[in-house]
C-alpha cells in the first residue's frame, strides 16, 4: 500500500493529498493540465519536499516531516520515467541501461531487454533512436534499478502518433509481466483506458476520486472533469462465444449478453470495453425488428441536465452505464430515479484484454 498524506504550496497551486493507493498494477494519475499530477509524483519521488505530512510505501516510511524524516530520491527505491527520456548521450544504449543497475537485477538484464524489444538497439547511441525507442530504453533503465515503485510522467506526451502506437503495446506487456506497481500520469483518456486498473483523479491540487477504473469512471464526480464529448462508460466483461454465422462475439455483462464485432480471443477471456454515452438510447419497451443488437434492461440511478442535453446514469447488476439524451426524450419517457427501462447500445469500443 502507498499511503499519501501531505501538503505543499507550489506557486499558485496548493497541493493537498490524502489517499491510499494499491501497490500492484498500473494506477493512472488523471487530471487536466496544471491540476498537480506531476507535482504529486515529484513529491513521492523526493524531488519536492512537502511542507508537512507522511508518505509510506509498503510500511517503509519515506517521509514523516513531524519526525524529521525525508529520504533522498536515491534512498527511496523509486524509478522515474520522464516525458523526455533523459538518456546519457555519450553512452550507448547498453551503457544507459547499466547505469544505476542494481546488482540483483543483473540476471534479469536480458529478460528486461527482451520484454521491451530493444535487443537490436544495445550498441547504438541515443542520438540515433526514435522517440519511442528512447522511451523504451528509459523504461528499461528505470526497471533495472530494482524499484519498489515506478513513476511515469506522461511518457507518450512528446511522441507523435506512430511512435505512441509503437510504445503502447510495450506498456501493456509491462503491466502484465512486471510485478512492480506503476503510477502513470496522463491526461489522455485512451491511454488510461488501455493501460490502467486503478485511477486517481486530481484537480487543482486535490484528490477528487480514487479507486478501480470502472468504478471511478462511472462516478458522478468524474463526469464534471471530463470534456462533454468524452462522457462514456467502462465495463469489465468476459468473452462467452463467437457467433456461428456472423462476425460477432458475445460477452457477458452480469447476467446479460452484449454483442461486439468479432475479436480474436478465447471464451473466458476478460476484456475491457468502452461505450460512449452518445451511443446509448433509451426506450420504455424492447422494440421488435430493430437493427440494434444490444438491448439491455437497466434501472435509472440519477440524471443531470447540462447545456441542452441530459446525462442519465443507469445500473445493470452492479455495472454502471451512461446515456446521453435530449430534454425532449427525458420528458417523453417521464424519466425518474428507480425507473426500469431498456438501453439500446449502437456501438461498442474494445479497449483492452485484461
UniProtKB/Swiss-Prot annotation:
Q: What InterPro entries does this protein's entry cite?
A: AAA+_ATPase (IPR003593), ABC_transporter-like_ATP-bd (IPR003439), ABC_transporter-like_CS (IPR017871), Mo/tungstate-bd_C_term_dom (IPR008995), ModC_ABC_ATP-bd (IPR011868), Molybdenum_import_ModC (IPR050334), Mop_domain (IPR004606), P-loop_NTPase (IPR027417)
Top enzyme category: translocase
MF terms in GO: ABC-type molybdate transporter activity; ATP binding; ATP hydrolysis activity
Pfam families, sorted: ABC_tran, TOBE
Protein family membership: Belongs to the ABC transporter superfamily. Molybdate importer (TC 3.A.1.8) family.
Q: What subunit structure does UniProt give?
A: The complex is composed of two ATP-binding proteins (ModC), two transmembrane proteins (ModB) and a solute-binding protein (ModA).
Q: What is the protein named?
A: Molybdenum import ATP-binding protein ModC
Species, as recorded: Photorhabdus laumondii subsp. laumondii (strain DSM 15139 / CIP 105565 / TT01) (Photorhabdus luminescens subsp. laumondii)
- Gene name of this polypeptide: modC
Amino acid at each position: 500500500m502507498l499511503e499519501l498524506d501531505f501538503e505543499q504550496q507550489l506557486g499558485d497551486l496548493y497541493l493537498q493529498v490524502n489517499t491510499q493507493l494499491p501497490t500492484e498494477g498500473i494506477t493512472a494519475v488523471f487530471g487536466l493540465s496544471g491540476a498537480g499530477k506531476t507535482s504529486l509524483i515529484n513529491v513521492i519521488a523526493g524531488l519536492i519536499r512537502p511542507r508537512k505530512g507522511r508518505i509510506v510505501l509498503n510500511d517503509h516510511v519515506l517521509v514523516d516531516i513531524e519526525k524529521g524524516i525525508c529520504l533522498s530520491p536515491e534512498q527511496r527505491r523509486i524509478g522515474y520515467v520522464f516525458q523526455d527520456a533523459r538518456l546519457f548521450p555519450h553512452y550507448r544504449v547498453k551503457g544507459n541501461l547499466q547505469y544505476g543497475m542494481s546488482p540483483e537485477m543483473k540476471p534479469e538484464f536480458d529478460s528486461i531487454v527482451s520484454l521491451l524489444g530493444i535487443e537490436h538497439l544495445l550498441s547504438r547511441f541515443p542520438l540515433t533512436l526514435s522517440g519511442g525507442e528512447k522511451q523504451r530504453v528509459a523504461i528499461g533503465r528505470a526497471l533495472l534499478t530494482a524499484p519498489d515503485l515506478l513513476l511515469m510522467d506522461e511518457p507518450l506526451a512528446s511522441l507523435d502518433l506512430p511512435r505512441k502506437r509503437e510504445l503502447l503495446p510495450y506498456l501493456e506487456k509491462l503491466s502484465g509481466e512486471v510485478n512492480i506497481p506503476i503510477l502513470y500520469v496522463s491526461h489522455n483518456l485512451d491511454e488510461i483506458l488501455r493501460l490502467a486498473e486503478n485511477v486517481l483523479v486530481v484537480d487543482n491540487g486535490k484528490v477528487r476520486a480514487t479507486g478501480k477504473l470502472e468504478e471511478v469512471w462511472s462516478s458522478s464526480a468524474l463526469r464534471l472533469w471530463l470534456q462533454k464529448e468524452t462522457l462514456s462508460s467502462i465495463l469489465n466483461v468476459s468473452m462467452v462465444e463467437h457467433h456461428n454465422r456472423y462476425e460477432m462475439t458475445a460477452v457477458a455483462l452480469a447476467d446479460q449478453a452484449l454483442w461486439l464485432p468479432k475479436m480474436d480471443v478465447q471464451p473466458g477471456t476478460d476484456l475491457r470495453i468502452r461505450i460512449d454515452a452518445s451511443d446509448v438510447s433509451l426506450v420504455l419497451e424492447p422494440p421488435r425488428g430493430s437493427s440494434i443488437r444490444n438491448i439491455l434492461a437497466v434501472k435509472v440511478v440519477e440524471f443531470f441536465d447540462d447545456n441542452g442535453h441530459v446525462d442519465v446514469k443507469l445500473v445493470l447488476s452492479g455495472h454502471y452505464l451512461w446515456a446521453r439524451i435530449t430534454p425532449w426524450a427525458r420528458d417523453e419517457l417521464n424519466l425518474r430515479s428507480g425507473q426500469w427501462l431498456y438501453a439500446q447500445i449502437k456501438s461498442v469500443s474494445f479497449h483492452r484484454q485484461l
